[in-house]
Swiss-Prot record:
Keyword terms of this UniProt record: Endoplasmic reticulum, Glycoprotein, Lipid metabolism, Lyase, Membrane, Pyridoxal phosphate, Sphingolipid metabolism, Transmembrane, Transmembrane helix
Entry protein name: Sphingosine-1-phosphate lyase
Processing after translation: Glycosylated.
Name of the encoding gene: DPL1
Residues carrying N6-(pyridoxal phosphate)lysine: 380
Superkingdom per UniProt: Eukaryota
Protein's organism: Saccharomyces cerevisiae (strain ATCC 204508 / S288c) (Baker's yeast)
Length: 589
C-alpha cells in the first residue's frame, strides 16, 4: 500500500480504501484515522455547500433533539421506566380529557354543571342581611363615626364567624385571647399611619422591625455574626423571597438562566407560586411511604446543572411531618446548593420544643450545616397580628439577592427589601408588642399546651379509632389521618355540619387538625366528636356522599376524567370573593 510504512499512516494513502479491507487488516487505529478524516471532509462539504439559513435551521433542530433526548434520559434516571410510563400515561390522559371537555361537543354540558357548582359556592360564601347597609359606591355624604361603628357591630353580629373562639377550627386563629387582642389593638392604633417604606418618618417602627427579626434569628440559632433577615407580609411572601434570592444568586454567581427548585410534594403551594411568578421549574419529589418525609435518594436524582435550591419543611402543612433536614443539609453541602427550610407553620412550636422539655428531636434550624435560609410565620404560633412573617438568611449576601435596587429612577434612588413597596408599620408593631409581651416562657408554655394536646389526639386515634390511620409520626402541632374503610371527605362534611372544621387533604385523601391555644383546651371534645362521627358513618355505610360537599369537590379535582374542571371551580371561588351578591359582579355596580 502506497504511503504506508510500518509505523506511520498516511491519511491520503488510506482515503478511498474499502472499509471491509481495513477491518481485514485489523488495524483499528488506522480505521479510526480514516473515519475521522471522512467526517472532516463531510463537515467541510456541508459548511461549504449549505446556505446559512438551512444551516441555522439544522442547528436549531439538533438543539431541539438534544434537549428532548437529554430530558427523556434525565426523567428516566429520576423515575425509572415504570414510574415514568405511568406519569406519561396520566399526563397524556389529563390532556386528552381536558381537550374533550373543552370541545364543542361537551363544552356546553360541562359549563352548565360548572355554573351550578359555582352558584352553590356563591350561595355558601356570599352572605348579607336586610338590616345591613350596602355600599356598591361611595355615599354622597360621609356617614358619622358612631353610625359606622354601629354598622361594624351589625356586620359582626348578623354575619357571624365560624366558631373559632370555641376551638372548633383547625389552625386559622392561633391564640385568640382577649388580653392579647387588646394589646394588639392599642399597638395598631398608635401606629396605624406608619409605613415601613419611610424609616426616616417612623424611626421607631424601624427599631421594632429590626428587633423582631433579631429575636426570631436567635430562636432559630442563626450565626450571631452573619445571620440576617427581613419581615414580610406572610408565609407566602417569605417563600417567594427565598426562591427569588436563590434565583438571582444563581444567575449572578453561576450564570443559570433556566433555574430549577427541588421540593417535596408536600412543600407549601407558595413554592409552586414562586416558580410560576419567577419563571422557574419546580421538581416535586415523592415521599418515603412509611415516614412521609421527602425521599433523599430521589432528591439526589433530581439534581442537575440548573438546580438552584433544595427545600425541606419543618413541618409540612399537609401531614405535620418534618423532613430530614440534616440529611438534606448533607446533600446541599455535597452539591454546593442552597437549602431553604420552610418553618412557617412550625414557627414558634419547633423553635421552643427543646426548652419545652421534648427529647430526641431532630435539628431543623441553622445548626444544620447547609441550611441557608428559613421562613417563620410570626402570625401563626407567634400569635402576632395577621400579615406577619420573617425570612431569615445565613448571611447578608443571600439576603441582598432578594432586594430590588434602582438608582436610575426619575423619582429618586429607589430600593425595597421585600416584594411590597409600602408596608403597614402597625402590623410589625403589633408583632413586636406580642412577642415582648409573651416572652420566652410564654411561648414555652404555649408549646407545651399545643403539642401536648396534639400528642393526646394522636394517641387517642391510635388506641380508640381503628378505622383511622395516623400518617407518619407527627411530633408537633398538626396530626393528619386517613382511612382504608371510610370516605374521609364525607367524614369531613359530617364534622363540619356539627360545627367542627378539619382541613381536607388529597394525594392521599386525608384530614388534619392543626392544634392552637384555642383547640388545645377542647381536645377531649375533638376526640369524642371524631369517634362518634366515625361510628355514625360506619353504621350508614350504604349512604351516598353529599353531591355538593367536600367529597364531590375533591373527587373532581383528583379524577383524570374531569381534568380542568377543578381549575374552573377554584376560579369561580376566587371570583365570588369580589361579588356584591350571588350572580352580581363588582364591576357592574
Amino acid at each position: 500500500m502506497s504511503g504506508v510504512s510500518n509505523k506511520t499512516v498516511s491519511i491520503n494513502g488510506w482515503y478511498g480504501m474499502p472499509i471491509h479491507l481495513l477491518r481485514e487488516e485489523g488495524d483499528f487505529a488506522q480505521f479510526m484515522i480514516l473515519t475521522i478524516n471522512e467526517l472532516k471532509i463531510a463537515i467541510h462539504g456541508y459548511l461549504r455547500n449549505t446556505p446559512w439559513y438551512n444551516m441555522l435551521k439544522d442547528y436549531l433542530f439538533v438543539i431541539f433533539c438534544y434537549k428532548l433526548i437529554s430530558n427523556f434520559f434525565y426523567l428516566l434516571k429520576v423515575y425509572g421506566p415504570v414510574r415514568l410510563a405511568v406519569r406519561t400515561y396520566e399526563h397524556s390522559s389529563r390532556r386528552l380529557f381536558r381537550w374533550l371537555l373543552d370541545s364543542p361537543f361537551l363544552r356546553g354540558t360541562v359549563e352548565k354543571e360548572v355554573t351550578k357548582v359555582k352558584q352553590s359556592i356563591e350561595d355558601e360564601l356570599i352572605r348579607s342581611d336586610s338590616q345591613l347597609m350596602n355600599f356598591p359606591q361611595l355615599p354622597s355624604n360621609g356617614i358619622p363615626q358612631d353610625d359606622v361603628i354601629e354598622e361594624l357591630n351589625k356586620l359582626n353580629d348578623l354575619i357571624p364567624h365560624t366558631q373559632w373562639k370555641e376551638g372548633k377550627v383547625s389552625g386559622a386563629v392561633y391564640h385568640g385571647g382577649d388580653d392579647l387582642i387588646h394589646l394588639q389593638t392599642i399597638a395598631y392604633e398608635k401606629y396605624c399611619v406608619a409605613n415601613q417604606l419611610h424609616p426616616d418618618v417612623f424611626p421607631a417602627v424601624r427599631k421594632m422591625e429590626s428587633e423582631v427579626v433579631s429575636m426570631v434569628l436567635r430562636m432559630f440559632n442563626a450565626p450571631s455574626d452573619t445571620g440576617c433577615g427581613t419581615t414580610t407580609s406572610g408565609g407566602t411572601e417569605s417563600l417567594l423571597l427565598a426562591c427569588l434570592s436563590a434565583k438571582m444568586y444563581a444567575l449572578h454567581h453561576r450564570g443559570i438562566t433556566e433555574p430549577e427548585i427541588i421540593a417535596p410534594v408536600t412543600a407549601h403551594a407558595g413554592f409552586d407560586k414562586a416558580a410560576y411568578y419567577f419563571g422557574m421549574k419546580l421538581r416535586h419529589v415523592e415521599l418515603d411511604p412509611t415516614t412521609y418525609q421527602v425521599d433523599l435518594g430521589k432528591v439526589k436524582k433530581f439534581i442537575n446543572k440548573n438546580t438552584i435550591l433544595l427545600v425541606g419543611s419543618a413541618p409540612n402543612f399537609p401531614h405535620g411531618i418534618a423532613d430530614d433536614i440534616e440529611g438534606l443539609g448533607k446533600i446541599a453541602q455535597k452539591y454546593k446548593l442552597p437549602l431553604h427550610v420552610d418553618s412557617c407553620l412550625g414557627s414558634f412550636i419547633v423553635s421552643f420544643m427543646e426548652k419545652a422539655g421534648y427529647k430526641n428531636l431532630p435539628l431543623l434550624d441553622f445548626r444544620v450545616p447547609g441550611v441557608t435560609s428559613i421562613s417563620c410565620d410570626t402570625h401563626k404560633y407567634g400569635f402576632a397580628p395577621k400579615g406577619s412573617s420573617v425570612i431569615m438568611y445565613r448571611n447578608s449576601d443571600l439576603r441582598m439577592h432578594q432586594y430590588y435596587v434602582n438608582p436610575a429612577w426619575t423619582g429618586g434612588l429607589y430600593g425595597s427589601p421585600t416584594l411590597a413597596g409600602s408596608r403597614p408599620g402597625a402590623i410589625v408593631v403589633g408583632c413586636w408588642a406580642t412577642m415582648v409581651n409573651m416572652g420566652e416562657n410564654g411561648y414555652i408554655e404555649s408549646c407545651q399546651e399545643i403539642v401536648g394536646a396534639a400528642m393526646k389526639f394522636k394517641k387517642y386515634i391510635q388506641e380508640n379509632i381503628p378505622d383511622l390511620n395516623i400518617m407518619g409520626n407527627p411530633r408537633y402541632s398538626v396530626i393528619s389521618f386517613s382511612s382504608k374503610t371510610l370516605n374521609i371527605h364525607e367524614l369531613s362534611d359530617r364534622l363540619s355540619k356539627k360545627g367542627w372544621h378539619f382541613n381536607a387533604l388529597q394525594k392521599p385523601v386525608a384530614l388534619h387538625m392543626a392544634f392552637t391555644r384555642l383547640s388545645a383546651h377542647v381536645v377531649d371534645e375533638i376526640c369524642d366528636i371524631l369517634r362518634t362521627t366515625v361510628q355514625e358513618l360506619k353504621s350508614e355505610s350504604n349512604s351516598k356522599p353529599s353531591p355538593d360537599g367536600t367529597s364531590a369537590l375533591y373527587g373532581v379535582a383528583g379524577s383524570v376524567k374531569t381534568a380542568g374542571v377543578a381549575d374552573k371551580l377554584i376560579v369561580g371561588f376566587l371570583d365570588a370573593l369580589y361579588k356584591l351578591g350571588p350572580g352580581e359582579d363588582t364591576a357592574t355596580k
